[in-house]
Amino acid sequence: MRVAFFGTPLWAVPVLDALRKRHQVVLVVSQPDKPQGRGLRPAPSPVARYAEAEGLPLLRPARLREEAFLEALRQAAPEVAVVAAYGKLIPKEALDIPPHGFLNLHPSLLPKYRGAAPVQRALLAGERETGVSIMRLDEGLDTGPLYAVWRTPILPDEDAVALGNRLRDKGVELLLEVLERLPELTPRPQEGEASYAPPLSKEEGRLDFGESAEALYRRHRAVQPWPGSYFFHRGQRVKALRLRPEPGEGEPGVVARVGPEGVVVGTASGLLLLLEVQPEGRRAMPAADWARGYGVAPGTRLGQV
């Protein structure tokens, strides 16, 4: 089929790569270049870089309602468009152009976790199960009817990166199956109570030791790779790069013990073992080395700004 692809982050690149091996990608649409790095120089998105490297037709419109973009989409004459983490709602003027509409690969069990951060929000909420949905876009936020759904348990130590990649990879399989049979398929309306998954804020990475160790571990897994989890010590931000819950009890925010494996901190329920950290302005280091260098010992209180 003639396919237009809409996507932006690195997560979406394997979707585009799989599509171009089975179908004719007639247009790639990604978000405009954004400032990146220390110099804040405009840089293309990962999807745009891939499209340029592979010689695929590429557009980076600021607004999808612009007539110049809509005309370019018409001229590309896609039979269907595929969306994977594009980052903007597609207006009706564009939705109506491909004869078979727009398909969206969404990593949740719709109608649960509509929006930008479904994987992260499912982890934060402590969901035991999630999945991926292939849907037909309408004008709403992930409200369109479903072509295919795949369910899976969330593995105990999966973070947002690993879970998101696993859901994407299965989603690619589903997407290709749907495209093979698209003319004969009829999508079904979403059923059940809807929930929403807004983007994460930087503050949501902060570890509050007044929560349980299990909740803190869920938070740590959910906020990878951005914003990452962190806490404060003596007014400085410390990134928590690796951690895990431990059995036992301790006073929330107070170091219970320090050993070769790391720093054990009390929480509202259970203990949290810090394995690797990165103090503000410093390199990553084992938590035990950080404790020695920064005077962290049993009885030290963490988490205070």
Swiss-Prot record:
The protein's Enzyme Commission number: 2.1.2.9
Keyword list, A-Z: Protein biosynthesis, Transferase
Family matches, as InterPro entries: Fmt (IPR005794), Formyl_trans_C (IPR005793), Formyl_transf_N (IPR002376), Formyl_transf_N_sf (IPR036477), Formyl_transferase-like_C_sf (IPR011034), Met-tRNA-FMT_C (IPR044135), Met-tRNA-FMT_N (IPR041711)
Matches recorded under Pfam families: Formyl_trans_C, Formyl_trans_N
One GO CC term, this protein: cytosol
Function according to Swiss-Prot or TrEMBL: Attaches a formyl group to the free amino group of methionyl-tRNA(fMet). The formyl group appears to play a dual role in the initiator identity of N-formylmethionyl-tRNA by promoting its recognition by IF2 and preventing the misappropriation of this tRNA by the elongation apparatus.
Protein family according to the UniProt entry: Belongs to the Fmt family.
Name of this chain's protein: Methionyl-tRNA formyltransferase
Gene assigned in the entry: fmt
